[in-house]
Design a protein with these regions (language model features):
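Residue-level detector of Asp-centered blade-edge/turn motifs that repeat once per structural unit
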Residues: 144-148, 212-215, 263-267, 320-321, ...
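Short, low-complexity, Lys/Arg-enriched N-terminal segments of secretory-pathway carbohydrate enzymes
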Residues: 1-26
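Blade-level signature of beta-propeller repeat domains, shared across WD40, Kelch, NHL, RCC1
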Residues: 412-444
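Beta-strand-rich domains and repeat architectures in extracellular enzymes and scaffolds
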Residues: 58-115, 120-170
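Conserved beta-propeller blade signature
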Residues: 150-152, 216-220, 269-271, 324-326, ...
Length: 444
């Protein structure tokens, strides 16, 4: 991960760094270029050469589509050489025996279990629809607005390549999904859709998470400096894009750096995460609260804590019926402070009680590449997360069933109803067609 130098002052966590020592064994690595991201890894690809393993792979019972490939996990349970943590870690891509980096990207739908075939269907597609060069325009808050069939998203707040954070706010953008579909329909499709800037008024400051909310879009704003507090702010998705602040304090205290937000489909309350990335990226002051998950009842105005005990809580979402919550902990990624591999890169699952509180925290999944950032469910309850190598997918029991493999970091993505998905990958924007439907809450 390439980052800016850390700011003066006490370091909240000690990052792990690795250097090659004299006499240390070298391992063959393929370097793969990546965006300069705040929540992303400067990626190394760790590869193992064993063509025979690839040739003898066992296929699942379901037929594999042309754009998919089966990944035999048993084929890499034992490796001839296992590199040390300085070489193989959360900031690297794992290339199974018999593959190389290009082979993994050539057929980007990776089937780890035949259940994934039901997710992708018989003819899935992955299309690059926009590239922003060195600018991380395609970051988070991926939110579909059905009346205009547009997908909204936000620029990376705090990314050095964008110059955003303390002196300049990140911005809201959108695309028309009709344009994305037109590009995707071409043979060997690649192209560019029109990416429009959304000039909200008053401006949403450093937006990060986003979700549908009563026919509008609800953003989690990270704040800016000591004088602009983090906010939950509602934006009209059509011109004049007027905004209204819903919440900007916890009993008179500033939140640390609001990150993501989701609506529980059962009780309709707002749940959001508060974390340290504004501080770790040098555009927010030292934290004044624990890193926690909050609940807002917008009828009574009551704000309550529903979960704590995180390193850095991040994405949050709910199962389609609202009975379970999923919260990402991206503690391994310390922003400008680097990485601590012993910290969480984990999805947790909670039961949501009838009164809206959380119970029975369980580890749902540990991420093999990067950290789990944005999290969403499909209509069948499968769980998706933006990770270091693309979008990873688990069934409701926490079994990894597949990946939409980009070979680069995705911080967030979202469904656009049935059979469509948009994936944000910082400099790149992708359009996906598949069989699954979104399971998120949308109220017109």
């Amino acid at each position: 991960m390439e980052t800016s130098p850390p700011s003066p002052g006490p370091e909240p966590y000690e990052p792990i760094t690795a250097e090659k020592k004299p006499g240390e064994k070298c391992y063959t690595m393929i370097f793969f270029p990546t965006a300069l991201l705040v929540l992303a890894a400067g990626v190394l690809i760790r590869a193992y050469s064993d063509p025979a393993t690839h040739a003898s792979q066992r296929l699942p019972r379901a037929e594999i589509p042309a754009q998919a490939q089966f990944i035999d996990q048993k084929g890499f349970n034992v490796l001839p050489t296992v590199p040390p943590p300085s070489v193989s870690n959360a900031t690297t891509f794992f290339v199974p025996p018999g593959y190389d980096a290009e082979a993994l990207k050539e057929k980007p739908f990776h089937v780890y279990d035949e259940e994934f075939c039901d997710v992708i269907g018989s003819n899935p597609t992955l299309t690059l629809i926009a590239n922003a060069g060195p600018h991380p325009l395609f970051h988070e808050a991926t939110t579909w607005y059905p009346p205009t069939d547009e997908m909204f998203f936000v620029q990376n707040a705090g990314a050095p390549a964008a110059g955003t954070g303390l002196n300049k706010s990140s911005i809201v953008l959108k695309i028309a999904l009709s344009e994305a579909a037109a590009v995707s329909s071409r043979r060997n499709a690649t192209g560019s859709v029109n990416v429009q800037t959304v000039d909200s008024s008053p401006m949403v400051i450093n937006p990060n998470g986003g979700t549908n909310y009563k026919g509008q879009i609800l953003f989690a704003g990270e704040g800016q400096g000591a004088d602009v507090p983090p906010e939950l702010i509602v934006m009209n998705p059509v011109e004049p894009y007027n905004t209204t602040v819903l919440l900007n304090n916890c009993f008179g205290r500033q939140f640390n750096s609001l990150n993501d937000v989701s609506i529980n489909p059962r009780n309709k309350d707002i749940y959001f995460t508060d974390t340290l990335y504004g501080y770790l990226q040098d555009f927010r002051p030292a934290p004044g609260l624990q890193n926690q998950v909050y609940r807002l009842n917008d009828v009574t105005g009551a704000v309550t804590v529903v979960a704590d005990g995180f390193s850095l809580p991040n994405g949050v979402t709910f199962s389609p019926n609202g009975s379970h919550a999923y919260v990402a902990d991206t503690g391994a990624n310390r922003g400008f402070w680097g990485w601590n591999q012993s910290y969480p890169a984990t999805l947790y699952r909670y039961g949501v009680q009838e009164d809206g509180t959380f119970e029975n925290r369980k580890v749902f999944a540990f991420i093999d590449s990067g950290v789990p950032d944005g999290v969403h469910c499909d209509s069948k309850g499968n769980v998706y997360a933006g990770c270091g190598d693309g979008v990873q997918v688990w069934n409701p029991s926490g079994k990894l069933i597949g990946k939409i493999y980009l070979g680069e970091v995705s911080a967030n993505f979202n469904f656009a109803g049935k059979g469509r998905m948009v994936i944000c990958a910082e400099e790149n924007l992708y359009y996906v067609t598949l069989a699954a439907s979104g399971g998120g809450y949308i109220e017109a």
